[in-house]
Curated annotation (Swiss-Prot):
Belongs to the conotoxin O2 family. It comes from Conus amadis (Amadis cone). Gamma-conotoxins may act on voltage-gated non-specific cation pacemaker channels (HCN). Residues 1-19 form the signal peptide. GO terms for cellular component: extracellular region. GO terms for molecular function: ion channel inhibitor activity; toxin activity. This is Conotoxin Am6.1. The lineage of its organism: Eukaryota, Metazoa, Spiralia, Lophotrochozoa, Mollusca.
Length: 84
């Protein structure tokens, strides 16, 4: 009778442990899907050009200022000379 009781206790512990890990696996899968979704969203964002890059329009530059066909270093600053 003691062996049966011990066997039932071990079975109960194993089943509860299995259920606990199964539930945690679902949460981690959701967390992974969430992080993948965020990463994909960041990759889809429009990239901007850095300072001294040739441009046609303000929206192409990170500083949002295209002056004399080059992106400026500081937002809103329009220089009259070409960058280095």
């Amino acid at each position: 009778m003691e062996k049966l009781t011990i066997l039932l206790l071990v079975a109960a512990v194993l089943m509860s442990t299995h259920a606990m890990f199964q539930g945690g696996g679902e949460k981690s899968r959701k967390a992974i899907n969430f992080s993948e979704t965020r990463k994909l969203a960041r990759n889809k964002q429009k990239r901007c050009d850095g300072w001294s890059t040739y441009c046609h329009d303000d929206s192409e530059c990170c500083s949002e200022t295209c002056a004399n066909s080059y992106c400026t270093l500081i937002k809103g600053v329009r220089t009259t000379s070409h960058p280095i």
